């Protein structure tokens, strides 16, 4: 009964977010992993962790049965805000040869993407936290072969609605 109530509540209110009832699925092993157990799971590699004002960002990679990098989906990112996890299943879809990194500066989370032949393009996304949510605020083209730096402002897009594969290299 409790699970049914939480399921209905998630469709009405939280849309992609539930603290303890959302699972990550390792695409190589098809293993369901509770978000509470991600950091201790043997098929998950913690690549990076960033902390700002009681909010934590975890950048992870999946491992296959042999402990090697999973190439079906290389990366995922989730946040821990007030003991609840915020996770978007579509966040890193179809980012094949992109190498992201998560950091924090002045209470702003930054995701850097390197991609292209010789990783010659770098894009940076700025995320802020407010009222228990994560918002995408702007994007900077840090370096590109065209040599044209560019800044794109977003209107506080909730991270639950972002799919970075649709934002990469759009300028």
Where do the model's predicted regions map?
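Classical Sec-dependent N-terminal signal peptides that target proteins to the secretory pathway
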Residues: 1-21
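Short N-terminal segments immediately surrounding and downstream of signal-peptide cleavage
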Residues: 20-43
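Acidic, small-residue rich beta-repeat scaffolds with periodic aromatic anchors
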Residues: 23-27, 105-171
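Acidic/hydrophobic-patterned starts of short beta strands in beta-sheet-rich repeat architectures
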Residues: 37, 49-62, 104-114
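Beta-propeller blade repeat segments, especially FG-GAP/WD-type strand-to-loop junctions
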Residues: 69-88, 126-129
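Short loop/turn motifs that cap or connect beta-strands within the blades
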Residues: 90-93
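Short glycine/acidic-enriched loop and turn motifs that connect beta-strands
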Residues: 63-68, 116-119
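Repeated scaffold domains used in trafficking and secretory/extracellular systems
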Residues: 96-102
């Amino acid at each position: 009964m409790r699970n049914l109530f939480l399921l209905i509540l998630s469709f009405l209110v939280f849309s992609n977010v539930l603290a303890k009832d959302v699972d990550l699925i390792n695409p190589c092993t098809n293993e369901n992993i509770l978000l509470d157990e991600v950091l201790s799971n043997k098929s998950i590699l913690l690549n990076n962790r960033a902390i700002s004002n009681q909010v934590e960002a975890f950048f992870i990679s999946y491992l296959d049965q042999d402990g090697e990098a999973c190439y079906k989906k290389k990366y995922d990112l989730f946040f821990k805000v007030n003991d609840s996890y915020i996770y978007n299943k579509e966040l890193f879809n179809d980012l094949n040869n992109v190498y992201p990194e998560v950091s924090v500066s002045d209470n702003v989370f930054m995701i850097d993407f390197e991609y292209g032949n010789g990783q010659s393009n770098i894009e940076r996304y700025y995320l802020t936290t407010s009222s228990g949510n994560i918002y995408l605020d702007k994007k900077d083209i840090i370096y590109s072969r065209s040599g044209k730096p560019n800044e794109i402002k977003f209107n506080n897009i909730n991270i639950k609605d972002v799919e970075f594969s649709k934002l990469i290299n759009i300028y």
